[in-house]
């Protein structure tokens, strides 16, 4: 990202507009900004938007991770190891329920070849005094039907 783009803090604080931004647009922008960093080997974008009490599931770990500290420790083990040349955020949908929002999407990433890794993601965001924060993440891999 270049320096003209909003920072994570701008997103978490509703782009500095006093909370008037469309929550759907803000949440999808937050996710894209974190995924942009993820693809460059930097998981900090997700750590920065995770709530202190976040819970996390993915297919590469045996148990749920509880809390931002546990998530940060897990992500440190993969820092610098992820390289995504491009990705597609397919059919993102945000469903608002009070001060919570559920983001669902399919994620297709490419790592320097045309081989695609396909994922499903569900994230639950909570609106707090700090803005929107992720309180639950669940990633699952789409296995080939071949």
Where are these regions (language model features)?
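A beta-strand edge to alpha-helix "cap/lid" segment located at domain peripheries
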Residues: 2-47, 55-146
């Amino acid at each position: 990202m270049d320096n003209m783009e909003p920072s994570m803090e701008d997103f978490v604080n509703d782009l500095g507009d006093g909370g008037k931004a469309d929550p759907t647009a803000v949440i999808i922008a937050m996710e894209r900004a974190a995924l942009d960093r993820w693809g460059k080997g930097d998981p900090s974008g997700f750590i920065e938007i995770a709530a202190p009490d976040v819970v996390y599931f993915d297919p590469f770990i045996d148990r749920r991770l509880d809390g931002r500290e546990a998530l940060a420790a897990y992500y440190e083990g993969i820092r610098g190891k992820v390289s995504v040349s491009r990705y597609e955020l397919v059919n993102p949908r945000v469903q608002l329920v009070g001060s919570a929002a559920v983001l669902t999407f399919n994620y297709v990433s490419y790592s320097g070849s045309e081989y695609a890794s396909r994922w499903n993601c569900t994230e639950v965001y909570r609106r707090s005094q700090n803005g929107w924060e992720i309180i639950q993440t669940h990633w699952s891999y789409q296995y080939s039907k071949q």
